[in-house]
């Protein structure tokens, strides 16, 4: 099992000037870093790959699709733009040596119609993602992680069961479920049950408190969560995802209106210590 940290805790995007962040994350004790290339044309993918290899770090990538790249849009031109942009992000992820590309990569982030998901939207999403996943499969072993998110960010995939149905209908082995405890605590009826239901289709995990603070400081039932991860034999990456309210563009997108720790470094290091201890205590008793 690997423990990772999210680049958005420290930087609003990832450019050449942000490469020292990889050394910093390694020094804090992390095994992996998740990078969001919000400026894809400025993302130094090859340099990330080389630096990570030197440091012994695993790289994962993620994204929240803007509305102009929304593959469940009723506009076929927007859906096609989303497919094309997804392929570009997959190419960048491969160039950076990423193991997983996950997140809200299957519809527009914050796209809400004011109605329940429709059969047309589901079909558009599955058809688009089948093409995207087939493209990814041709070029690498990259895992695509479908992350269920809370109802305030999307009406499309809110639960582990939704994500499972989606990946089964896409039907390609490189598409997995990406669970995030921040969203789970808002949407799931049974924390451990959701993990057990996903089982071997779990490809990636975000470890976030219910309030986006230091893991262990809130309401997430970490013991039962880690017990269920252990039960299914999950051996992938668990990444702490949180954000700094001083980064205005990210804070606005993620609705972070207060300090969640004394510093991003405190959130990262104390969160890592808590998660390692929580996992070890469960794993030792299995």
Regions found by a protein language model. Give the residues of each.
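Histidine-acidic metal/acid-base catalytic patches
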Residues: 1-11, 15-26, 46, 97-99, ...
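Active-site-proximal loop/turn and secondary-structure-junction residues that shape catalytic pockets
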Residues: 9-11, 37-39, 65-67, 105-110, ...
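N-terminal substrate-binding region of glycoside hydrolase catalytic domains
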Residues: 22-42, 68
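Hydrophobic residues within beta-strands of alpha/beta enzymes
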Residues: 33, 60, 101, 144, ...
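Active-site-adjacent beta->alpha loops and helix N-cap segments on the catalytic face
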Residues: 41-51
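Active-site acidic/histidine proton-transfer and metal-coordination neighborhood
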Residues: 53-54, 76-176, 258, 262-266, ...
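A short acidic, helix-capping loop that chelates divalent metal ions and anchors anionic groups
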Residues: 68-73, 109-115, 152-153, 186, ...
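The substrate-binding groove and active-site-proximal loops of carbohydrate-active enzymes
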Residues: 70-80, 119, 211-216
